[in-house]
Amino acid sequence: MRHAFTLIELTVTLCILSILSAIAIPRAGRFLDGIHVRGAVIEIESLFSAARHIAIARGAQTTVEIDTAARAIYVSGGGARLRNANIGADHDVRLSATRSGMSYSATGMGYGAANLSVVVRRNSAVDTVFVSRLGRLRH
């Protein structure tokens, strides 16, 4: 009765494992990119939602500022900065936006003339957050 593997069996096994890992590793990278982008999108949506709720609760205008160079988003109201999120550093993504910011009125309605889009990218993974003039979110 034989209790060991031959050199040929070990070589074939290593070749099969090498081929499988060569196929799986690029997919794992794309999968991780998607996870980072999705996390950033969720955080951006929560910031816009929080800004809207703060405007309603305080009965005053609240502003969301998007700094694409710093890859950060700021929520301010009443002359004070209420929330900061360094999206780019936290999630290792790039941001681009159609406008530099948006304001919510005391009723929670968006203040401004047009919709806002925030595009979140990391390598080949891309997602977009849309904020309507009414203040509604979708992606």
What are these regions (language model features)?
Residues 1-5, 138-139:
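N-terminal leader/signal peptides at the extreme start of proteins
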Residues 3-15:
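N-terminal signal-anchor/signal peptide hydrophobic helix marking the start
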Residues 11, 19, 23-139:
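N-terminal helix-rich module
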